[in-house]
Amino acid sequence: MDYYELLGVSRTASADEIKSAYRKLALKLHPDRNKEEGAAEKFAQVSEAYSVLSDTEKRAHYDRFGSAPGAGMPGGDXFGGMGGMGGVGFDPMDIFEQLFGGAAGMGGRGRRGPARGDDLETEVRITLEQARAGEEVEVTVDRLTECEHCHGTRTEPGGKPPVTCSTCNGSGAVRGQARTIFGVVETQQVCPTCKGDGKMVVDPCTVCHGRGRTLKSEPVKVKLPKGIDEGYRIRVAGQGNEGPGGNGDLYVHIEMEPHPELHRQDENLIFPARIGFATAALGGRIQVPTLDGPQEVEVKPGTQHGELHRLRGQGMPRLQGAGTGDLIVDYEIVVPKHLNAEAKDALQAYARAVGDEVPEEHEGLFGKIGKLFGRD
């Protein structure tokens, strides 16, 4: 079994690439979401692959010897744990919760008492129109929520209640001693048996496997502040993972959908307006797209290339401060590459009228070659 092949990454993949690959596969194969035959075993396999490849020392050992450290060692169960995976006491759910958060993962280890659920992060792409109006958008979030079967008790309904952990006597922590330069000091660590809970489940819930929570995809409403821009993030309180000590928060990262015609520059919007030479010289009217719809704008006679015209109050609301930005029309004078005979005559007449030098008719390549050799 090739760990790199399991995760679908190359042997030179970075830590971020390995993490991203595992994240996608774990969400797809998680037992709470995928009931297909073999999904649980595949979930365990990709979890073990990630547990090895995400650890620098374990990955180096695997790259050198083709196996994880300790695999197949005497006294070890080469096929122990969930899904027939190697490693003594290996639990793929622990690997999952360390990445996605959970009381048995990042949120609970090292804490005493009820643990708060972990914070979650996601992203949403919005339009300029949505950012300007401060609309409410919806995102779908994968959250750990209370198991509906056991209601978070972790015990199968009707089963035997949890018992006090014999290792820590229900305290959730174990004491020890450590030798330091200041002498021997007393230490306290999370109980390795009950993982800080103080109790051991006797009859685990058949749905959540004794964890008290299951993974669910849920819609979350997010109110956009007016004028929000790319790179900002919004905190939605209580929409992270659920935990016995309260819910974590959800952080939504903002990405902007490119507008087909307008460019944003802080609170201002820029419209590159391409106009012809005649319109620039004589003036005229053009249609300018705004977030409220097309607006007719007058082009003054003698408009120069790069000249700016400001439509006040037609930009974005200032995110921090009062007022609204402007929509700036940036004129770009387009010089035609090809002219018909009538247009050429008109421009030559104009040039003579204003005293501009009129260039001679452009000769083709064969005409120049003919002159070079004395041909008419």
Curated annotation (Swiss-Prot):
SUPFAM superfamilies for this protein: Chaperone J-domain, DnaJ/Hsp40 cysteine-rich domain, HSP40/DnaJ peptide-binding domain
Annotated protein name in UniProt: Chaperone protein DnaJ
Free-text domain note: The J domain is necessary and sufficient to stimulate DnaK ATPase activity. Zinc center 1 plays an important role in the autonomous, DnaK-independent chaperone activity of DnaJ. Zinc center 2 is essential for interaction with DnaK and for DnaJ activity.
Gene Ontology biological-process annotations: chaperone cofactor-dependent protein refolding; DNA replication; protein refolding; response to heat
Organism listed in the record: Deinococcus radiodurans (strain ATCC 13939 / DSM 20539 / JCM 16871 / CCUG 27074 / LMG 4051 / NBRC 15346 / NCIMB 9279 / VKM B-1422 / R1)
CXXCXGXG motif repeat residue intervals: 147-154, 165-172, 191-198, 205-212
Localization (cell): Cytoplasm
Necessary cofactors: Zn(2+)
Recorded family membership: Belongs to the DnaJ family.
Zinc finger residue extent: CR-type: 134-217
Binding note for cofactor: Binds 2 Zn(2+) ions per monomer.
